[in-house]
């Protein structure tokens, strides 16, 4: 069985549910009282994709402006970036272009990026339509998912989807696999690996 170690960055504005998304995927847990991420936090989980074992090293980055200079260092060497927004907050969606530019500038050229519209359990508070999210993703040529970290809706689909995309790029020869370690997969030009929120009835 082939085994790949992939580095995944979860990024985007603050309070859109990045930490909750990661907690659900790695621990199958959800909490209405999540501590605000300070800098960068890290978890791992292994999954099986098309008879290949994928070990995901997932970095949860703080969305606050004061941590941006720290968190952007962790984009280097990443194979996957999940760019998250809150479907109930228009401002989080409007800020996406800046975050997208940051990911593309600080990451390798062929990094797999997915746009994640979180909190889709809050249907009565939705202000960003599915069509808007899909259009944004299409214009930027990236993947698109809507999730609920609270209800676990489509959480697995996100990580399965981005992992399958990476594997397809490896098979196409776009990514060169030298060995099994995270820094062994080169996406375009070689890069070096750089070493409480308010309560809500919706997911955080």
From Swiss-Prot:
Gene Ontology biological-process annotations: phagocytosis; vesicle-mediated transport
Its localization reads: Cell membrane
Q: Where is this motif: Effector region?
A: 34-42
Spell out the SUPFAM superfamilies in the cross-references: P-loop containing nucleoside triphosphate hydrolases
Pull one GO CC term from this UniProt entry.
Golgi apparatus
Sample GO molecular function, one term: GTP binding
Which residues are noted in the entry as GTP-binding?
Answer: 12-19, 60-64, 118-121
Q: Where is it chiefly localized?
A: membrane
Give start-end ranges for the coiled-coil region(s).
none
- Which PROSITE patterns does the UniProt entry name for this protein? RAB
| Signal sequence, start to end | none
Sites of S-geranylgeranyl cysteine lipid attachment are: 202-203
Topological category with respect to the lipid bilayer: Lipid-anchor
Q: Keyword set for this entry?
A: Cell membrane, GTP-binding, Lipoprotein, Membrane, Nucleotide-binding, Prenylation
Q: Which family does it belong to?
A: Belongs to the small GTPase superfamily. Rab family.
- Its recorded name reads Ras-related protein RabQ
- Organism listed in the record: Dictyostelium discoideum
Upper taxonomic lineage: Eukaryota, Amoebozoa, Evosea, Eumycetozoa, Dictyostelia
Q: Which gene encodes it?
A: rabQ
